[in-house]
């Protein structure tokens, strides 16, 4: 019962984050002239595009968890690079500086997401101490 509930919540989370990223991109693209008016608005656009990155990464990661199982994790090369390049291309349609600042804000957001997920979902592996005695052979000083 709990596996199906977890799977349903993962599907719902994937759909909601995908829809929010599309709506946020559409809003940012529709208001691109407003973001080009001042430097502060361009920085705000980069910050909002970092949310597009986080939402699209959540959508992709949750969709992969549905397909490949609950223990599947997003890796750097396929998922994160794909979502980041997609976000940078979308931010470049609004303003070039939006693309640059979205990369910086996205990396900061990814760092904090990694810290939060490590805190809550990491499994502690007990360390194994190496034996201190040697069997035969030369002894080094």
Swiss-Prot record:
It is found in: Membrane. One of its GO terms (cellular component) is oligosaccharyltransferase complex. It is a multi-pass membrane protein. One of its GO terms (biological process) is protein N-linked glycosylation. Keywords: Membrane, Transmembrane, Transmembrane helix. It comes from the Eukaryota. The chain crosses the membrane at residues 11-31, 42-62, 74-94, 97-117. InterPro entries: KRTCAP2. Belongs to the KRTCAP2 family. Component of the oligosaccharyltransferase (OST) complex. Subunit of the oligosaccharyl transferase (OST) complex that catalyzes the initial transfer of a defined glycan (Glc(3)Man(9)GlcNAc(2) in eukaryotes) from the lipid carrier dolichol-pyrophosphate to an asparagine residue within an Asn-X-Ser/Thr consensus motif in nascent polypeptide chains, the first step in protein N-glycosylation. N-glycosylation occurs cotranslationally and the complex associates with the Sec61 complex at the channel-forming translocon complex that mediates protein translocation across the endoplasmic reticulum (ER). All subunits are required for a maximal enzyme activity. This is Protein KRTCAP2 homolog. It comes from Drosophila melanogaster.
